[in-house]
A protein has these predicted regions:
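Contiguous alpha-helical scaffold segments within structured protein domains
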Residues: 1-14, 20, 27, 32-57, ...
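A short, Trp-centered hydrophobic/proline-enriched beta-strand micro-motif
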Residues: 25-32, 82-84, 165-167, 195-201
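Short coil/turn segments at secondary-structure boundaries
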Residues: 32, 165-170, 200-204, 279, ...
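An anion-binding catalytic pocket shared by soluble metabolic enzymes
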Residues: 39-47, 94-102, 111, 171-258, ...
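Non-catalytic accessory segments adjacent to catalytic cores
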Residues: 60-176, 271-272, 403-406
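A residue-level signal for conserved active-site and pocket-lining positions in enzyme catalytic cores
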Residues: 85, 104, 162, 214, ...
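Short, solvent-exposed loop/turn elements at beta->coil junctions and helix N-caps
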Residues: 88, 202-204, 348-352
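Conserved hydrophobic core element of enzyme catalytic domains
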Residues: 294-406
Length: 406
């Protein structure tokens, strides 16, 4: 029988903020307001694709866990070996799974380190590395703004003439640098400007998502749904008035209801006493406001063996990133969106060996490939949508990544 590989989790004293600890060796992150997990080095990584990708991911993760001997003196969510995941939007595209060699976690002032191997506890950086600013050249994406508006108009016609109720159309922009792009400076900037979002990085996909697709913690399930958006002006009084108008907007409330319904329906078979608030709240971010609803529930006792992969298969794609009905919306996206989404709008986050974890939807993000960055934004299209307004909304959703690069 092969010898098991040791995995050790130990408490930490004071250290640099999580995002300042990262070396340049394939960083992975999931950080919100300073708390979360960061990791580096690759103990194991693989990719999955196809209709059985969530099941294939589960099998691979469990195969890796069978090779490990875990010594964990901290015993909270996020300790022990951690799987970082980034699933594609479309099953036919590649999804990535990464188990880092070293993970540092922090929650409510307590922190820990996990490392794989029989070496001594790794030493952490004691001073933040100075990262140089890069120069970027911006270009159009797969479609020009005008071409994208034409596709939005096509989608509206489809909604008005078929059973389709809502579809999410995304667009991209391409950015080039004269050298390989270092994600760490971008991640720090995103965290500073958008501390209430989840700052993620997995295999070159980096971003700041405001949308928590799934949190599993000791049998409790949470999903935050965002749909319905309005840009901020920077004037507090004006923004309060805009927030009130967003909360009354029939178009945005309709779009939001589709998204909430799709998540609640997906969770219902697994949960008892699912809580769906009657009306959404307005979530204020640095540059936009969203209608938001937190859907919560407790796993049915007989379903305690259900894991995140099972629930993700039912949750994704939700109406917030695809549409309603799902199959009709997914087909229209494939027909008219004009680009591969890759891992944009797919589940991204982490799981631990207990089955606890947090996964968001990969929004407000970009994919780094050496010296190129491709950033994404999507808009929910319903019968009352206007192509020009949707273009404006998409530009607002590009703002976090644009700002993080400046």
């Amino acid at each position: 029988m092969p010898q098991l590989i040791p995995v050790t989790t130990a408490r930490l004293g004071e250290h640099l903020p999580l995002l300042e600890l990262l070396p340049d060796s394939a960083p992975v992150t999931w950080v919100r307001g300073g708390d979360g997990l960061v990791g580096w080095g690759s103990y194991a990584t693989t990719s999955v694709s196809g209709p059985n990708r969530f099941n294939d991911a589960r099998k691979w993760w469990h195969q890796q866990l069978e090779k490990l001997a875990i010594s964990d003196s901290v015993h909270v969510s996020g300790t022990g070996p951690i799987l970082f995941t980034s699933f594609s939007f479309d099953p036919s595209e590649e999804s990535i799974l990464v188990i880092p060699e070293i993970v540092v976690g922090m929650r409510n002032g307590s922190s820990w380190i996990t490392w794989i191997g029989d070496q001594a506890q790794p030493k952490l950086a004691e001073s933040a590395q100075m990262l140089e600013d890069a120069e970027y050249n911006w270009g159009d994406g797969s479609l020009s703004p005008g071409e994208w508006q034409i596709r939005v108009a096509q989608a509206i016609k489809e909604i008005e003439s078929t059973k389709l109720e809502k579809v999410v159309l995304a667009r991209d922009l391409k950015v080039n640098s004269h050298r390989a792009i270092d994600p760490r400076k971008i991640l720090r900037n995103l965290s500073a400007e958008y501390p209430s979002t989840w700052i993620f990085a997995v295999n070159g996909l980096i971003g700041a998502t405001p949308e928590l697709l799934l949190r599993l913690s000791r049998g409790m399930v949470t999903s935050r749904v965002l749909a319905g958006t309005i840009s901020k002006t920077g004037d507090d009084e004006r923004d309060l008035a805009l927030a009130a108008s967003l909360a009354r907007s029939s178009k945005d409330l309709e779009e939001h209801e589709y998204a909430v319904r799709s998540v609640a329906d997906a969770l219902d078979p697994f949960c008892t006493s699912t809580n769906v608030p009657e009306s959404p709240f307005v979530l204020h971010l640095a540059n936009v406001m969203h209608l938001a609803t937190d859907v919560t529930g407790a796993l049915i006792e007989s379903k305690k063996s259900v894991d995140a992969f099972t629930i993700l298969e039912k949750l994704h794609p939700s109406a917030a990133v695809c549409g309603t009905p799902t199959e009709n919306a997914a087909k229209l996206i494939k027909d008219i969106e004009g680009m591969p989404r890759g891992r944009y709008a797919g589940p991204v986050g982490w799981l631990d060996a207990r089955g606890d974890g947090e996964l968001g939807i990969a929004l407000r993000c970009g994919q780094i490939t050496e010296n190129e960055l491709r950033i994404f934004a999507g808009c929910g299209i319903v019968a009352g949508s206007n192509p020009e307004k949707e273009l404006t909304e998409s530009n607002a959703k590009f703002a976090p990544m644009r700002s993080a690069l400046s």
